[in-house]
Amino acid sequence: MKKITILFLAVLFLGTLDYAVAQENIPVRPDAPYLTNKNIPAFNLLLIDGKNFSQNNIPDFKYTIIIYFSPDCGHCQHEATEMVKNIDSLKHVYFVWAGSRSIPELKAFSEKYGFNALPNVVCGQDQHYSIPSYYQVKYTPFVAVYDNRKQFVKAYEMGVEIPELLKLIGTH
């Protein structure tokens, strides 16, 4: 019985590992909407304060960054920590943090990282799942960078380290 249990667990582990590797190797389709249409996509978020927010509400900043995230994602937490730590270098960037989790979960995340005290950050729920559909998100955090004309610059499918982001927006 012990051998059967061990065999079962080994097969289960290998199957899970195989699936994860297969998912990782799925390339972004060249006809993905964000690669063929350079404009910021249409979306509607329910902000954590209960207000509605769409792409039309994005104020004029040198850059706009859309981050699709999950509050319990360790990489998303790291991204938030680093963003807040470097916010003085990112004052010319408007951040839209969008997730599909519940408002209380998103609000707790936002409060933990002090988003409410930052004038260039909003956080809300993508109730219609439009952002991950548009970008074909496979991992969180997914980061999309747009310039001051709201034109696509670059996407980071697994988040971006702040030095790399600063290099991009410093040269673009």
Feature locations, PLM:
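Bacterial Sec-dependent N-terminal signal peptides
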Residues: M1-P27, H172
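Short active-site neighborhood of thiol/selenol oxidoreductases, capturing the structured segment around
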Residues: S54-Q77, M83
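Short, internal strand/loop/helix patches
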Residues: Y113-A144
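Structural microenvironment flanking redox-active thiols in thiol-disulfide oxidoreductases
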Residues: Q77-G114, H128-S133
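N-terminal "domain-start" segment that seeds a small globular fold
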Residues: Q23-N56
